[in-house]
């Protein structure tokens, strides 16, 4: 990796990426030396553009000869870093990041002679520093350099969510009210609220469009995107101005939220009772009276789910589309469902019940499984295209990702179950620092450092810090959490696990 990225930190105004946050040096020495080291590593990861911090690189692995794209600032990767800085009273880097990515959004976006939508946000960007000319240049990637060449659907949603978190944390509404930020939100919303051929309120997506950025069979209506979509809509609703343009979008958002919450809570939700109902489904039903609305064939239910599903507990399945229900558990989508109140309070508690009941499967020795269970053998070959990185219990195919610790912690605090977070943090503290902050862990229980995992992975570091700070001060959860709106509450039905 070229060190020019770090040279720029010193080149223009003397600021250094090694500045240490007040929290880390003043308080964490007495609390936990691991926190101090984490803060130092997070500060080292800062990227500067013309003397100002604009993000954090994905990883700074001294031992790795191949840099690949780990020296870039990824939008989704920066979110836990941003939350850590906000919780520590350092909003400048977050503000700079939001404005810089907004500027990048306005660029022409061409991939193989095809122009992307105006609202598309980059997957990542890289700062190139010329020490001779003392100039900094930003090069953005909208998916043209990614595996599979897929544009990130989640980037725009994370941007809106982070703008709300900045506003909630600082109390500064002026940034969100800027004309360019209002326009940026509207452009993102235009992409996902446009009318088309869909009969569902969910977003149709390609494989590899989110954190699961390789072929993993999530094409269709993946839970991660739907949950982020819901949260971004609610975030935008609270920040759009009540002018003519803003009101037009607000009306669309309210209608979409109502339809989306009903759809997700009705058709994506799975618990013991609903599983039993699907098991007994009739097929080939026509007309609006159909119970099996998606014509899911009971014989397509995988064997593992019957043992996995506890009597108390439930979760949002990975995907629902015609004649297809992906029963896999995806951690990020379910945690975001809790934080955004896409899940009802009863469903939120049921998700936490499931995590407790299936701790060995979903948490094991390192929190948290990104996806469960892993695909193997013939299924792995067909679904992933024989992807050597996504072999069973590795990477996105059942790997354990420490960054998810902050999401689990936030969900635990919101549902009044902090003991779940405390237990998970203790597991992480036993290994993360000693292992050099790996990107992910492999194995059915998450025991082994991932076979291709980078060390000094920034979001593993930031995820741990955010989890610790939220446990230390649970009010921090408010910047990323939302309470349920009364108009979205559905009539409660089915699910013995909710009571």
From Swiss-Prot:
Q: Sorted alphabetically, which InterPro entries does this protein's record hold?
A: 6-hairpin_glycosidase_sf, 6hp_glycosidase-like_sf, Glyco_hydro_100
The record's catalysed reaction(s) read: Hydrolysis of terminal non-reducing beta-D-fructofuranoside residues in beta-D-fructofuranosides
Which parts of the sequence carry Phosphothreonine? 20
Where are the Phosphoserine modifications? 11, 497
GO-annotated molecular function: beta-fructofuranosidase activity; endo-alpha-N-acetylgalactosaminidase activity
The reply on keyword Iron is: no
The free-text function statement in the UniProt record for this protein reads:
Invertase that cleaves sucrose into glucose and fructose.
Give the family from UniProt.
Answer: Belongs to the glycosyl hydrolase 100 family.
Q: What is this protein called?
A: Probable alkaline/neutral invertase F
Name of the gene: INVF
């Amino acid at each position: 990796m070229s060190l020019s990225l770090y040279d720029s930190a010193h080149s223009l105004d003397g600021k250094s990426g090694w500045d240490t946050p007040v929290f880390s040096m003043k308080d964490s020495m007495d609390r936990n030396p691991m926190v101090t080291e984490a803060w130092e590593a997070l500060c080292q990861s800062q990227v500067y553009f013309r003397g100002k911090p604009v993000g954090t690189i994905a990883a700074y692995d001294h031992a790795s000869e191949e840099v690949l794209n780990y020296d870039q600032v990824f939008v989704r990767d920066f979110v836990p870093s941003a939350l850590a800085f906000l919780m520590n009273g350092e909003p400048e880097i977050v503000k700079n990041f939001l404005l810089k990515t907004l500027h990048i959004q306005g660029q022409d976006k061409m991939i193989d002679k095809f122009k992307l939508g105006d609202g598309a946000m980059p997957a990542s960007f890289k700062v190139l520093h010329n020490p001779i000319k003392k100039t900094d240049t930003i090069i953005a990637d909208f998916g043209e350099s990614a595996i599979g060449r897929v544009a990130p659907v989640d980037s725009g949603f994370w941007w809106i969510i982070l703008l709300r978190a900045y506003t909630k944390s600082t109390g500064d509404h002026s940034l969100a009210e800027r004309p360019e930020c209002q326009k940026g939100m509207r452009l993102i919303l235009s992409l996902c609220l446009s009318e088309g051929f869909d009969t569902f309120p969910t977003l149709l997506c390609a494989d590899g469009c989110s954190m699961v950025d390789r072929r993993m069979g999530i094409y269709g209506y993946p839970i991660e995107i739907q949950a982020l979509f819901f949260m971004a809509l609610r975030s935008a609703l609270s920040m759009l101005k009540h002018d003519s343009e803003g009101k037009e979008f607000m009306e669309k958002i309210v209608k979409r939220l109502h339809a989306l919450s009903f759809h997700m809570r009705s058709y994506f939700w799975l618990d013991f009772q609903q599983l039993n109902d699907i098991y007994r489904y009739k097929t080939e039903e026509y007309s609006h009276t159909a119970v099996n609305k998606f014509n899911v064939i009971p014989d397509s239910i995988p064997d593992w789910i019957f043992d996995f599903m506890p009597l108390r507990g439930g979760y949002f399945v990975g995907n629902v589309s015609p004649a297809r229900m992906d029963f896999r558990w995806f951690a990020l989508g379910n945690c975001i469902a809790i934080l955004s109140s896409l899940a009802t309070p009863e469903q939120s508690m049921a998700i936490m019940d499931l995590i407790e009941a299936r701790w060995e499967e979903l948490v094991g020795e390192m929190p948290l499984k990104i996806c469960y269970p892993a695909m193997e053998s013939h299924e792995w070959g067909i679904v992933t295209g024989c992807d050597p990185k996504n072999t069973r219990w590795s990477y996105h195919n059942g790997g354990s990702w420490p960054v998810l610790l902050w999401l689990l912690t936030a969900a635990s605090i919101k549902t009044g179950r902090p003991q779940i977070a405390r237990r998970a943090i203790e597991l992480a503290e036993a290994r993360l620092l000693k292992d050099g902050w790996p990107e992910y862990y492999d194995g059915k229980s998450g025991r082994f450092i991932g076979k291709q995992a980078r060390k000094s992975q920034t979001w593993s570091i930031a995820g741990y810090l955010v989890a610790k700070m939220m446990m230390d001060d649970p009010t921090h959860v408010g910047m990323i959490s939302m309470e349920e709106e009364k108009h979205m509450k559905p009539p409660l039905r089915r699910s013995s696990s909710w009571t």
